[in-house]
């Protein structure tokens, strides 16, 4: 009888990047006889704690003990989907045969600086290359995010409403207050605003100046799982380039995403949703301003601020009609 494999996946951060690993994890679990373990940071545990395709999760909260714990597992393979100094050190310490995702540094440089796109595919497809040695095939079932249905949130999620993630790692990745306000003013459905603590005041100002009085500010008030639950039950999800976009993609709900300094051409757009998805780009060029969106070559505050509110509204109506 053939021995069951034991495979360790590594991805430390962040929300979207971890969610984007889930098709590879699922396909490995279903296509080979293997125990699947996953190493990530403690603060991202909730993203995968309910994932039925992962047998054990290790959390990188104590580096003094994690190496000995992993050594005891006796892994056959390591699939490194982060490929940074820390993950490379772990591979060195464990001395296990490993396969790492390519960071495509040259290709990213050519795209950002010269508009030459040699990436030409989604990052999920790049992740799948790490398991070619196991003859793993993409089942094309998209992303996985398992959220418990019993989450209790003080909101009537059974009614029709829109969810809108107004956050972003950098100001240059966020729509402005007035852009959002101008859209919300003309939307008849209730709207929930989602983001972290940093956007609380941002959301409050939108509510203060908007004519639409059916807006709920959940910024900084919900866990990732609770936010995911609201997104899952909404009729449409609007978002900047955020990790929550990938969670929404796993639920196969309609998505409108907004792109400024980053661009879908980098390969991190919503992956394989079965419902409608519209990527709205500020500059009709496939050349990103920067890798993570911290710098804009067109406007100090970010070229995302040039996306017309009336076009956003048109796309909302297009999806909902």
Give the positions of each predicted feature.
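Nucleotide-sugar donor-binding patch of glycosyltransferase catalytic domains
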Residues: 101-107, 214-218, 249-320
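Conserved nucleotide-sugar phosphate-binding/catalytic loop shared by glycosyltransferases and other
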Residues: 35-66, 277-284
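Nucleotide-sugar donor-binding and catalytic loop/hinge architecture
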Residues: 1-5, 149-162
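Conserved nucleotide-diphosphate donor binding/catalytic pocket of glycan-assembly enzymes
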Residues: 58-144, 161-165, 262-265, 271
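Short amphipathic alpha-helix
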Residues: 18-28, 43-46
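A short, glycine/small-residue-rich beta-strand->loop->alpha-helix junction that serves as a flexible
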Residues: 10-20, 47, 80, 169-176
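Surface-exposed amphipathic alpha-helices with a cationic face
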Residues: 22-32, 184-185, 232
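Donor-binding and catalytic core of enzymes assembling or modifying cell-surface/extracellular glycoconjugates
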Residues: 172, 176-261
């Amino acid at each position: 009888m053939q021995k069951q494999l034991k495979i360790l996946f590594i991805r430390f951060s962040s929300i979207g990047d971890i969610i984007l690993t889930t098709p590879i994890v699922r396909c490995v679990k279903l296509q080979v006889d293997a125990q699947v373990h996953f190493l990530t940071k403690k603060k991202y545990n909730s993203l995968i704690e309910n994932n039925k395709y992962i047998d054990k999760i290790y959390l990188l909260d104590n580096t003094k003990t994690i190496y000995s714990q992993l050594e005891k597992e006796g892994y056959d393979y390591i699939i490194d989907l982060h490929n940074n100094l820390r993950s490379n050190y772990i591979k060195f310490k464990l001395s296990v045969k490993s396969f790492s995702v390519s960071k495509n540094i040259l290709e990213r440089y050519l795209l950002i600086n010269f508009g030459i796109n040699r990436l030409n595919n989604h990052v999920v497809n790049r992740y799948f290359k790490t398991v070619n040695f196991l003859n793993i095939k993409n089942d094309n079932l998209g992303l996985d995010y398992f959220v418990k249905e019993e989450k209790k949130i003080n909101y009537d999620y059974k009614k029709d409403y829109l969810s809108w993630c107004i956050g972003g790692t950098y100001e240059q990745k966020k729509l402005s207050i007035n852009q959002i306000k101008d859209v919300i003013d003309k939307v008849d459905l209730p709207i929930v605003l989602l983001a972290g603590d940093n956007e609380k005041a941002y959301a409050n100002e939108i509510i203060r100046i908007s004519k639409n009085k059916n807006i709920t500010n959940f910024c900084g008030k919900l866990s990732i799982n609770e936010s995911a639950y609201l997104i899952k039950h909404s009729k449409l999800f609007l978002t900047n380039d955020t990790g929550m976009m990938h969670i929404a993609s796993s639920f196969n709900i309609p998505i409108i995403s907004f792109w400024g300094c980053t661009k879908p051409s980098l390969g991190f757009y919503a992956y394989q949703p079965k419902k409608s998805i519209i990527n709205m780009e500020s500059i009709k060029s496939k050349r990103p301003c920067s890798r993570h969106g911290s710098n804009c070559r067109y406007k100090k505050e970010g070229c995302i601020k040039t996306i017309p509110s009336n076009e956003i509204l048109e796309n909302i109506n297009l999806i909902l009609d």
